[in-house]
A protein has these predicted regions:
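Short, small/polar-rich motifs associated with maturation and membrane association
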Residues: 1-241, 254, 620
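A short alpha-helix capping/helix-coil boundary motif
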Residues: 2-4, 174-176, 285, 397, ...
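Extracellular/periplasmic, surface-exposed regions of secreted and cell-surface proteins
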Residues: 14, 60, 243-252, 258-262, ...
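Short linear motifs in intrinsically disordered
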Residues: 50-56, 296, 699, 708
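Conserved small-residue
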Residues: 120-171, 269-281, 642-719
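Flexible loop and strand-edge segments within Gram-negative outer membrane beta-barrel domains
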Residues: 130-132, 173-213, 217-220, 231-322, ...
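Active-site-proximal polar cores
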Residues: 383-384
Length: 719
C-alpha cells in the first residue's frame, strides 16, 4: 500500500460516459485534476489536463497506458479500461523523472479472467448541441444600432428610415437582406454514435480480453447536399484491443498486448477552418448580402449575359468588405485526414522465490507506430455584388473542379524498454517492499530529430504492524534536451503514513470510523517540459541576403544567429510538500480524502529582461536562462458514499473540490515605472489590462475624470 497522494477511478464509472476522447471522461471526477476543453470540433475535442493547476511554463501531465508512455491515450475506448490512477505528490511521481513533475496518469486496460467466454455489447446514441450560441441582431436592429453609433461619434446616420423598413418587412430580400448567418449555417444539434463489443475468458494457462469499437460523430454545420463531397466537420474511428496472458509455468507469466485504431476526419478547408468560419459568422452583419442570389430575378452580368445557377454551383453573393460565410463553408474545399495507429507490448514476469522469497523480475518491450495522411482539396470561387441597376458585378474566378493540393505525410515510432526487480516480504509485524528499475523511452519521427530518455530509480517501503509506514523513492533520469554536464537529474523523496485506525485506542471509534490514515511527503523532482531542446547550441538562419564582392560581384549569403547558445541550460527544480488524510466511515460506505500541498519551483527557464542593448540582441534572440522562481499552493478533497439496496441495486454519490493559486516569485524583470506592471507577485501568465470603471453619462463626468490619453471620449464610452 502506497503512502503518497493518489486517486483511483474505476473503469466501470467511465464505461458509459458519452465522449470520443478519454480526457473529457475524466473531467470533474477526480480532485486536483482540471480539464479545459477548447474545441468541440469532431475529432479535435481533446481537453488539456492539469494536475494541481498551472505551476510553470510546461504543465502537461505524463500519461501511461499499461506502463508505457502513449501520446494518443485519448483514443482508448472507455469499455477497455480497468482503472485510472492519478499520481499527485513528489513521492508518487519521482519514479517517472523529468517527464512526470506535473503529475502522472496511469491507465490500466482490462485483462481476461478464467471461465467461459463472456460477451458484452455496448451501444450508445448521443444527441449533442452547443451549450450556448450567440444570437445576432436582425438586419433592422443592426441598421438602427449602426446609425446610433454614428450619431454618438458625431457622424451622420448611415441607413435611411426607408432602408430600415425594407430590412424589416423583407419586401426585397436580395437588395435588403436579413440573413441569420448563425441560424442558417449551424444545426440545432447533431448525433454521435458509439459501439463496443468485448469478449473475455480463459481456460487452463491462458486468459484473454478482446475489444472492438466504433465511434462516429457528425458535424454541426448545415452544408449543401448537392455536392459529391462533404465540407462538414465529420469524424469516425475504429478501435481494436487484444490482451492475452499465458502462464508458461506456475512462476512465469507472459503477457502480449495489441491495440490500434484507424481514424478519419473531415473539415472545411482552411488552416484554422472552424475558427475562421466562426469569425466570419460573428462579424458578418445580417445586412451585408444574401447567402446567394436566386434565379427568379433573371440576373445579368455587365455584358448583359444571363447568370444562372447550376447544380452545386449557386450564384454566390459578396462584397469587398465581408467574406460570405456560406461560401467559405460550401465553396472553399475541404481537408481530409486519415490517421493510423498500432501498438504492441510483450512482458515477462518471473518469480524468483527459489533465490529469495518475495523476489521477482519483470521485463517489457513495447513499440507503437503512428501515421498521418492529410489532403487539402482547395477551390476558388467567384462572387457577385448586386448593383443599383440590377446588374450583378462579378469578382474573382471559380474553378469547376477541386484542385489536388500536395498530400502531407507524418509518421512516428516509439520504443520503450522496462526492467524491474521487485521484493515484497511480510515477516510477523514487518512488511518490507522494494523495487529497482531501468526505463528507456525513444521517439522517432520523420520530420524531427529522434530523442531518448533513460531513467533508473527505486522505491523502498517499510511498514510496521500495519500502523506505521515509511517510503523512500528516487528517480535518476537523463534528458536529451541538455548537454552532457546538465543532462541527468536526481529526484529524491520520502513519505510517511500513520494508520491511526489500526491503533488499539481507536477500537472505541470503530463502529463509526472504519479507517483513518494520516500521511505526508516531501521531495524534489525535476521538470524539462518547459525547456526547448538543444538550447545549449547556437541556431543559425540563412537570410538569403549578403555581401557582393569578388571580380564577378557575386552575392554571398549571410547567416543570422537566431539563438545564442546557453551551455548551462538545464531542467527546472520543484520542491513539493504534501499533507493528507484518508477517512472511511460506516463500514467504508462513506469515504473522504483531504490534501494540502505546496510546490516551489526554481530554475524556471525564462528569457531575461535585464541585459545590455550593447549585446545587439532583442528578447527574440536572447538565450533563456534558469532564473525564474514560482510557487503554487493548493488544497483538495473528495467525499464519496456507496451503498446497496437489497442484493441487486447499488448506488453511489461523489463530489470533490480543488483549489490552487500560483504566483511568480522572480522572473528577472526589467525596471517598470509602476509596481503593478511586474509579473512578480501575480499568477503566471497574468495579463496587464485596463479596468473599466463604468460608462460616462455626461460631458460633465468626462471633464471631471482623468484625461484619456488613448482616444477622445463622449458620453456612452467606457471610462
Amino acid at each position: 500500500e502506497f503512502s503518497g497522494a493518489s486517486d483511483v477511478i474505476s473503469g466501470k464509472v467511465l464505461e458509459n460516459v458519452p465522449v470520443q476522447h478519454l480526457s473529457n471522461a475524466l473531467s470533474g471526477r477526480i480532485s486536483g485534476l482540471t480539464t479545459i476543453q477548447r474545441s468541440g470540433e469532431p475529432g479535435n475535442d481533446e481537453a488539456s489536463i492539469y494536475i494541481r493547476g498551472i505551476r510553470s511554463n510546461g504543465n502537461g501531465a505524463l500519461v501511461l497506458i499499461d506502463g508505457q508512455e502513449r501520446n494518443y491515450y485519448g483514443m482508448v475506448q472507455t469499455q477497455e479500461i480497468e482503472r485510472v490512477t492519478i499520481l499527485k505528490d513528489a513521492s508518487a511521481i519521482a519514479l517517472y523523472g523529468m517527464r512526470g513533475a506535473n503529475g502522472v496518469i496511469l491507465i490500466e486496460t482490462k485483462s481476461g479472467r478464467l471461465g467461459k467466454p463472456r460477451v458484452s455489447l455496448n451501444i450508445q446514441g448521443i444527441y449533442q448541441q452547443n451549450m450556448r450560441v450567440p444570437k445576432a441582431v436582425n438586419a433592422a436592429e443592426y441598421a438602427q444600432s449602426y446609425n446610433e453609433a454614428n450619431i454618438n461619434d458625431g457622424l451622420n446616420p448611415f441607413y435611411t428610415e426607408t432602408e430600415i423598413n425594407k430590412f424589416a418587412n423583407h419586401s426585397d430580400p436580395e437588395r435588403y437582406p436579413d440573413v441569420d448567418w448563425i441560424g442558417n449555417l449551424l444545426k440545432k444539434g447533431t448525433f454521435m454514435q458509439r459501439y463496443n463489443a468485448t469478449v473475455e475468458g480463459g481456460s487452463g494457462r491462458t486468459r484473454y480480453f478482446v475489444s472492438l469499437g466504433y465511434t462516429g460523430q457528425a458535424g454541426m454545420f448545415n452544408t449543401e447536399k448537392e455536392q459529391n463531397y462533404s465540407t462538414n466537420t465529420e469524424f469516425s474511428r475504429i478501435n481494436f484491443r487484444s490482451n492475452v496472458d499465458f502462464d508458461i509455468t506456475s512462476t512465469t507469466l507472459l503477457s502480449v498486448k495489441l491495440d490500434g485504431w484507424m481514424q478519419s476526419e473531415n473539415s472545411p478547408y482552411h488552416d484554422q477552418a472552424q475558427q475562421y468560419i466562426f469569425q466570419n459568422l460573428l462579424k458578418t452583419p445580417a445586412t451585408a448580402f444574401p447567402m446567394y442570389y436566386k434565379d427568379t430575378h433573371n440576373y445579368v452580368d455587365q455584358s448583359g449575359n444571363p447568370i444562372k445557377s447550376q447544380p452545386g454551383d449557386r450564384i454566390v453573393a459578396g462584397n469587398d468588405k465581408y467574406i460570405n460565410p456560406w461560401a467559405i463553408l460550401n465553396r472553399g474545399g475541404y481537408t481530409a485526414i486519415d490517421k493510423r495507429y498500432g501498438a504492441f507490448s510483450v512482458s515477462l514476469k518471473q518469480d524468483l522465490d527459489f533465490l529469495l522469497k518475495g523476489l521477482s523480475l519483470y521485463g517489457q518491450i513495447s513499440m507503437d507506430v503512428y501515421n498521418l495522411q492529410k489532403q487539402n482539396r482547395t477551390r476558388s470561387f467567384n462572387y457577385y455584388t448586386l448593383q443599383n441597376n440590377g446588374v450583378l458585378q462579378k469578382y474573382g474566378t471559380s474553378e469547376e473542379m477541386i484542385s489536388n493540393a500536395a498530400m502531407k505525410y507524418g509518421d512516428a515510432r516509439n520504443t520503450t524498454l522496462n526492467f524491474k526487480l521487485s521484493y515484497n516480504r511480510i515477516s510477523g509485524k514487518h512488511n518490507v517492499s522494494g523495487m529497482m528499475f531501468y526505463d528507456q523511452y525513444e521517439y522517432n519521427q520523420s520530420i524531427v530529430l529522434p530523442y531518448r530518455y533513460q531513467t533508473v530509480g527505486g522505491w523502498f517501503a517499510y511498514k510496521y504492524d500495519n500502523r506505521y509506514q515509511i517510503d523512500a523513492t528516487f528517480g535518476y533520469q537523463g534528458s536529451y534536451k541538455f548537454n552532457n554536464e546538465n543532462r541527468w537529474g536526481l529526484s529524491p523523496t520520502v513519505s510517511l503514513a500513520w494508520y491511526a485506525s489500526n491503533e488499539k485506542f481507536f477500537d472505541v471509534l470503530k463502529p463509526a470510523i472504519s479507517n483513518l490514515k494520516i500521511r505526508g511527503s516531501i521531495g524534489k523532482v525535476n521538470n524539462d517540459r518547459a525547456v526547448s531542446a538543444y538550447m545549449y547550441m547556437s541556431r543559425l538562419q540563412n537570410l538569403n541576403e549578403g555581401i557582393y564582392f569578388g571580380n564577378d560581384m557575386a552575392q554571398y549569403t549571410s547567416l543570422l544567429e537566431t539563438q545564442q547558445a546557453n551551455p548551462s541550460a538545464t531542467y527546472e527544480k520543484s520542491t513539493q510538500i504534501n499533507l493528507g488524510a484518508d477517512l472511511g466511515m460506516f463500514s467504508n460506505r462513506l469515504n473522504a480524502t483531504f490534501d494540502i500541498w505546496k510546490d516551489r519551483r526554481t530554475g524556471v527557464y525564462t528569457i531575461p529582461s535585464t541585459f545590455s542593448s550593447m549585446l545587439g540582441y532583442t528578447t527574440i534572440y536572447m538565450p533563456g536562462k534558469n532564473i525564474g522562481k514560482m510557487e503554487t499552493k493548493g488544497l483538495e478533497g473528495s467525499l464519496n458514499w456507496k451503498d446497496n439496496i437489497g442484493k441487486d441495486f447499488t448506488y453511489f454519490l461523489s463530489g470533490n473540490i480543488s483549489y490552487s493559486k500560483n504566483k511568480v516569485i522572480d522572473m528577472d524583470e526589467a525596471l517598470q515605472p509602476y509596481d503593478y506592471m511586474y509579473s512578480k507577485g501575480h499568477p503566471y501568465g497574468t495579463s496587464l489590462v485596463y479596468i473599466a470603471d463604468g460608462i460616462f453619462q455626461s460631458y460633465e463626468e468626462i471633464a471631471a475624470a482623468p484625461v484619456h490619453t488613448l482616444n477622445s471620449v463622449v458620453p456612452g464610452d467606457i471610462r
